[in-house]
């Protein structure tokens, strides 16, 4: 099937095409790969190469990205299994929404810290006080998971929120995290719709078959 034929069939029956896409593994490999890329970028580029110590919100964001990976792996076991798909989608939506919230909170802290810096002659004292007052070195992960003890290099906060000055095209790390989560959600929404449509169709077919 050519690309033009794919687009024509998608235009004619978008929900059916989404149902087919979400029932196969490739799209979920993409989701897992994207989340792994974000995690590895944070660890190897920002933490190791740029020597930027992760803050409390940063490790929470890593946790949410790890949840996206786990959600994708659950679905990849069998994308056609409704129980696995439900568990995976619930975890993925939780991780994306919560990750966006943590990123938004980090952005607000970053803005507040740098606002204090702009009004102070002492950059390090002002940024440290503003960021440190909003962050903790003892994170509280969901379900009480001691990830900072199990994997301290990845999940133990050693920096203050908002202390970094990294920016690209005028946007800081928190902004890009918000964009990443928003992109995840925009992509997951039609896949969720496709799965739900497929689930309801299968259910109706089962009911019709049982009533014959």
From Swiss-Prot:
Q: Does the record bear RNA-binding in its keywords?
A: no
Tell me what topology the record assigns in the membrane.
Multi-pass membrane protein
Give the transmembrane ranges.
Answer: 27-49, 59-76, 83-102, 177-199
Subcellular location, in the record's words?
Cell inner membrane
Q: Which GO terms describe its molecular function?
A: protein-disulfide reductase activity
- Note whether Amino-acid biosynthesis occurs among the keywords: no
Q: Which UniProt keywords apply?
A: Cell inner membrane, Cell membrane, Disulfide bond, Electron transport, Membrane, Oxidoreductase, Redox-active center, Transmembrane, Transmembrane helix, Transport
Taken from the UniProt entry, a GO cellular component term is: plasma membrane
Q: Which InterPro entries match?
A: DiS_bond_form_DsbB/BdbC, DsbB, DsbB-like_sf
Disulfide bond residue pairs? 55-58, 135-161
Output the GO biological process annotations, alphabetical, semicolon-separated: protein folding
Which family does the entry's similarity section mention?
A: Belongs to the DsbB family. DsbI subfamily.
Q: What does this protein do?
A: Required for disulfide bond formation in some proteins. Part of a redox system composed of DsbI and DsbL that mediates formation of an essential disulfide bond in AssT.
What's the subunit arrangement here? Interacts with DsbL.
User: This chain belongs to which protein, by name?
Assistant: Putative protein-disulfide oxidoreductase DsbI
Organism name: Shewanella oneidensis (strain ATCC 700550 / JCM 31522 / CIP 106686 / LMG 19005 / NCIMB 14063 / MR-1)
Record gene name: dsbI
């Amino acid at each position: 099937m050519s690309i033009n034929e794919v687009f024509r069939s998608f235009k004619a029956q978008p929900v059916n095409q989404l149902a087919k896409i979400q029932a196969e593994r490739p799209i979920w490999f993409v989701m897992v790969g994207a989340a792994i890329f974000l995690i590895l970028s944070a660890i190897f580029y920002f933490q190791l190469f740029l020597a930027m110590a992760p803050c409390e919100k940063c490790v929470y964001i890593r946790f949410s990205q790890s949840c996206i990976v786990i959600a994708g792996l659950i679905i990849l076991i069998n994308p056609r299994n409704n129980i696995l798909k439900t568990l995976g989608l619930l975890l993925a939506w939780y991780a994306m929404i919560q990750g966006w919230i943590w990123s938004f909170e980090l952005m607000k802290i970053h803005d507040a810290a740098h606002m204090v810096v702009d009004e102070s002659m002492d950059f390090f004292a002002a940024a440290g006080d503003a960021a440190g007052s909003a962050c903790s070195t003892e994170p509280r992960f969901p379900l009480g998971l001691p990830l900072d003890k199990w994997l301290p290099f990845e999940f133990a906060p050693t920096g203050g929120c908002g202390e970094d000055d990294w920016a690209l095209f005028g946007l800081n790390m928190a902004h890009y995290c918000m964009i990443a989560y928003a992109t995840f959600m925009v992509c997951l929404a039609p896949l969720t719709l496709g799965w739900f449509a497929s689930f309801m169709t299968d259910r109706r077919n089962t009911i019709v078959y049982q009533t014959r």
